[in-house]
Regions:
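Domain-length accessory/inserted modules outside core catalytic folds
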Residues: 1-25, 32-121
Length: 121
Protein backbone atom coordinates (compact mmCIF):
# COMPACT_ATOMS: atom_id res chain seq x y z
CA UNK A 1 0.00 0.00 0.00
CA UNK A 2 1.23 3.46 -0.90
CA UNK A 3 0.13 4.73 2.52
CA UNK A 4 2.25 2.18 4.42
CA UNK A 5 5.21 2.80 2.14
CA UNK A 6 4.91 6.52 2.93
CA UNK A 7 4.84 5.79 6.68
CA UNK A 8 7.98 3.67 6.29
CA UNK A 9 9.80 6.12 4.00
CA UNK A 10 10.77 8.76 6.55
CA UNK A 11 9.36 11.45 4.24
CA UNK A 12 6.75 12.56 6.79
CA UNK A 13 7.42 14.08 10.21
CA UNK A 14 5.21 12.59 12.90
CA UNK A 15 2.91 14.75 15.01
CA UNK A 16 0.01 14.27 17.41
CA UNK A 17 -3.59 15.33 17.99
CA UNK A 18 -4.33 16.47 14.40
CA UNK A 19 -4.19 14.83 11.00
CA UNK A 20 -1.66 17.50 9.98
CA UNK A 21 -0.48 20.53 11.90
CA UNK A 22 2.53 22.52 10.75
CA UNK A 23 3.48 19.64 8.42
CA UNK A 24 3.63 17.17 11.31
CA UNK A 25 1.31 14.28 10.58
CA UNK A 26 -0.71 11.64 12.38
CA UNK A 27 -0.41 8.26 10.66
CA UNK A 28 -3.94 8.84 9.30
CA UNK A 29 -2.96 12.32 8.13
CA UNK A 30 -0.29 10.76 5.92
CA UNK A 31 -3.03 8.81 4.14
CA UNK A 32 -5.10 11.99 3.79
CA UNK A 33 -2.13 13.87 2.36
CA UNK A 34 -1.57 11.18 -0.27
CA UNK A 35 -5.27 11.24 -1.20
CA UNK A 36 -5.29 15.05 -1.38
CA UNK A 37 -2.34 15.01 -3.80
CA UNK A 38 -4.41 12.70 -6.01
CA UNK A 39 -7.35 15.11 -5.85
CA UNK A 40 -9.52 12.62 -3.98
CA UNK A 41 -9.72 14.59 -0.72
CA UNK A 42 -10.15 18.35 -0.25
CA UNK A 43 -7.21 19.89 1.64
CA UNK A 44 -7.68 23.24 3.40
CA UNK A 45 -4.83 24.92 5.31
CA UNK A 46 -6.04 27.14 8.14
CA UNK A 47 -4.19 30.14 9.60
CA UNK A 48 -3.27 28.25 12.78
CA UNK A 49 -1.27 25.67 10.80
CA UNK A 50 -3.91 22.97 11.12
CA UNK A 51 -4.90 21.27 7.89
CA UNK A 52 -8.43 20.05 7.24
CA UNK A 53 -9.07 17.12 4.93
CA UNK A 54 -12.69 17.10 3.76
CA UNK A 55 -13.32 19.75 6.45
CA UNK A 56 -12.03 17.55 9.30
CA UNK A 57 -8.75 18.01 11.19
CA UNK A 58 -8.72 15.24 13.82
CA UNK A 59 -10.69 12.33 12.32
CA UNK A 60 -11.21 10.81 8.88
CA UNK A 61 -14.15 11.65 6.65
CA UNK A 62 -16.54 8.91 5.60
CA UNK A 63 -15.04 9.04 2.10
CA UNK A 64 -11.51 8.42 3.40
CA UNK A 65 -12.73 5.64 5.70
CA UNK A 66 -14.33 3.96 2.70
CA UNK A 67 -11.32 4.48 0.41
CA UNK A 68 -8.90 3.03 2.97
CA UNK A 69 -11.33 0.29 4.11
CA UNK A 70 -10.79 1.25 7.75
CA UNK A 71 -12.98 0.58 10.78
CA UNK A 72 -14.12 4.09 11.61
CA UNK A 73 -12.84 7.64 11.71
CA UNK A 74 -9.81 6.92 13.92
CA UNK A 75 -8.81 3.60 12.38
CA UNK A 76 -10.33 1.62 15.24
CA UNK A 77 -9.69 -2.05 15.83
CA UNK A 78 -12.41 -4.66 16.13
CA UNK A 79 -9.97 -6.96 17.93
CA UNK A 80 -7.12 -5.96 20.18
CA UNK A 81 -3.76 -7.69 20.02
CA UNK A 82 -1.71 -7.86 23.22
CA UNK A 83 1.51 -6.68 21.59
CA UNK A 84 -0.18 -3.47 20.41
CA UNK A 85 -2.43 -2.25 23.27
CA UNK A 86 -4.24 0.56 21.48
CA UNK A 87 -7.85 0.96 20.39
CA UNK A 88 -7.13 2.72 17.13
CA UNK A 89 -4.40 3.86 14.77
CA UNK A 90 -4.93 7.42 16.01
CA UNK A 91 -4.44 6.41 19.66
CA UNK A 92 -1.33 4.40 18.73
CA UNK A 93 0.06 7.45 16.95
CA UNK A 94 -0.76 9.84 19.79
CA UNK A 95 0.39 7.27 22.36
CA UNK A 96 3.95 7.24 21.05
CA UNK A 97 4.11 4.45 18.48
CA UNK A 98 6.34 5.42 15.56
CA UNK A 99 5.23 5.37 11.95
CA UNK A 100 7.44 2.30 11.44
CA UNK A 101 5.77 0.47 14.35
CA UNK A 102 2.30 1.41 13.12
CA UNK A 103 3.05 0.30 9.55
CA UNK A 104 4.51 -2.99 10.82
CA UNK A 105 1.39 -3.62 12.92
CA UNK A 106 -0.89 -2.92 9.95
CA UNK A 107 1.12 -5.25 7.69
CA UNK A 108 1.08 -8.01 10.31
CA UNK A 109 -2.62 -7.61 11.23
CA UNK A 110 -4.63 -6.45 8.21
CA UNK A 111 -7.66 -8.38 9.46
CA UNK A 112 -7.72 -6.21 12.60
CA UNK A 113 -7.17 -2.85 10.90
CA UNK A 114 -9.22 -3.10 7.73
CA UNK A 115 -12.96 -3.67 7.42
CA UNK A 116 -12.28 -6.08 4.54
CA UNK A 117 -8.61 -7.03 4.41
CA UNK A 118 -9.21 -9.05 1.24
CA UNK A 119 -9.88 -5.82 -0.67
CA UNK A 120 -6.69 -4.14 0.55
CA UNK A 121 -3.53 -5.12 -1.26
Amino acid sequence: LEWLEALESGAYEQGKDCLNKDNKFCCLGVACDILSKKGTVLKTVKENGIVDYDNLSTILSEEVIDLLKLNGSTGGFWNIRDEFPHLSLASANDGGKTFLEIAAFIRKNPDVVFSDAREVQ
